Amino acid sequence: MKFSSVLALAASAKLVASHATVFAVWINDEDQGLGNTADGYIRTPPNNSPVTDVTSTDLTCNVNGDQAAAKTLEVAAGDKITFEWHHNSRDSSDDIIADSHKGPVLVYMAPTEAGSAGKNWVKIYEDGYNDGTWAVDTLIANKGKHSVTVPDVPAGNYLFRPEIIALHEGNREGGAQLYMECVQFKVTSDGTTQLPEGVSLPGAYTATDEGILFDIYSSFDSYPIPGPAVWDGASSGSGSSGSGSSSSAAATSSAEKTATSTTAAATTTAVATSTSSATQVQPTSVATFTTSVRPTTSAAPTTSAPTSSAAPTGGTGTGSIQIYQQCGGMNYKGATGCASGLTCKQWNPYYHQCVQA
């Protein structure tokens, strides 16, 4: 097999070992139980593979995201919503997402009907790159949790869309990996702050946006978070706190958004003080996520072969690693031996992968 074909196949395999989805939600620090089950409240995809085509309708709420979940959680303005991400299971040993998957964490919201159609998405939270720390690093440190505060919007049904953009392959067009789900909420308080028009998803990103096509292995001091500015009517949880201590995050327009990844400060908006009436859903078992490869209809990128096939660095374990699994890279601690007929290729300093020899 030609090396270019191997590279294309590896790109479509999505580096399946290190992905993540939202497993659960907390409201005002109360666990709402597993939401990614058949009777849950998250529009959960069939696997934890990322979306890499920013023009795909899967960018709205992921695969099957147009299908409503069984339940809807109730919240009120001022309530704190905490999203909890995991790789394979809601277990203390879960690695959340590979630490090589550097990138920003964002949250959008939209009225349910419009949001399901990919329209009127309003960004209410973002965290990117601050003083050498990526939002994904903070997410892992906080055991997969990040928080937002429910704005003082009119009563009704809304979708909240947490998102991770992993940039470990963002140095090539089509390499960024986007992870998102839509969580169903009913806002019971009746606020007077109307959501602005919002953006379309897909539509808000392009494959060549500075924050999508971004080389994390180059020298840089700041990172331009993709998409619109954070709505100035949003009051979102701090990006540095897993418990989601409340702080305001906003900007007045997309044009005023700077290339730094710090969350823009703005005057805190007033929120109602009513408390959540969410029905608590207790998990009956710990769900696990089976990682699989989702085929895509878009053409695989044609990329020149790496100039070096350096031996894996950082791996200390031994074992027989299967095709497309990680076998090395900076800070990698797992096994480094590929199965028979495979070789460990270096795609970048942080990620080496078993591919056909």
UniProtKB/Swiss-Prot annotation:
Record text about domains: Has a modular structure: an endo-beta-1,4-glucanase catalytic module at the N-terminus, a linker rich in serines and threonines, and a C-terminal carbohydrate-binding module (CBM). The genes for catalytic modules and CBMs seem to have evolved separately and have been linked by gene fusion.
Residue numbers binding O2: H168, Q177
CBM1 domain sequence ranges: 319-355
BP-aspect Gene Ontology terms: cellulose catabolic process; glucan catabolic process
Protein name from the UniProt record: AA9 family lytic polysaccharide monooxygenase B
Annotated region described as Catalytic, given as residue ranges: 19-234
Naturally occurring in which organism (per UniProt): Emericella nidulans (strain FGSC A4 / ATCC 38163 / CBS 112.46 / NRRL 194 / M139)
Annotated spans, Ser/Thr-rich linker: 235-318
Localization, UniProt: Secreted
Residues binding Cu(2+): H19, H101, Y179
Family to which the UniProt record says this protein belongs: Belongs to the polysaccharide monooxygenase AA9 family.
Enzyme Commission numbers on file: 1.14.99.56
S-S bridge residues: C61-C182
SUPFAM superfamilies for this protein: Cellulose-binding domain
Gene Ontology CC: one annotated term: extracellular region
PANTHER family: ENDO-BETA-1,4-GLUCANASE D, PUTATIVE (AFU_ORTHOLOGUE AFUA_1G12560)-RELATED
